[in-house]
Amino acid sequence: MNKVIDTADQAVASINDGATIMMGGFGLSGIPENLVAALHRRGTRELTIVSNNAGVDGFGIGLLLTSRQVRKMISTYVGENKEFERQFLQKEIEVELVPQGTLAERMRAGGAGIAAFYTPTGVGTLIAEGKETREFEG
């Protein structure tokens, strides 16, 4: 099976509405511009985007936010995108804020086939509200 794909449009052809996509980038560096542009052209909607940030207005993930293609954002920082802020305040987008280290560990664990892990990060904060807590050896 040939795993080489010639274009970004071909690469996203099988990404359907409602998909969860993890995107790289840190601030404005490392943004997967070709992936974002191809998803934008395809018009894939109801996406859950996992990234450490929500991009900026009209660029990167911000392009998908402006075209209302993102249903949920799982991120560690979302502070520079006015369209994200507007959608969040109007309750038009679901948001899961996660500490940076916890998000990285979730990615690592998922890639390794580990279904769950425990971390003390966030215990006793707003992030922990509504989530299971356990005490070990304590």
Protein language model regions, located:
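Conserved alpha/beta enzyme-core scaffold
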Residues: 1-138
